[in-house]
Curated annotation (Swiss-Prot):
Expressed by the venom gland. This is Snaclec coagulation factor IX/factor X-binding protein subunit B. Disulfide bonds join 2-13. One of its GO terms (molecular function) is metal ion binding.
Amino acid sequence: DCPSDWSPYEGHCYRVFTEPQNWADAEKFC
């Protein structure tokens, strides 16, 4: 199960952020 503000997709959880981020920033943010 995913947190309420995350979206399940192919067995993983994804979260949509309001501000765009590149992958490097997203990985550091996690």
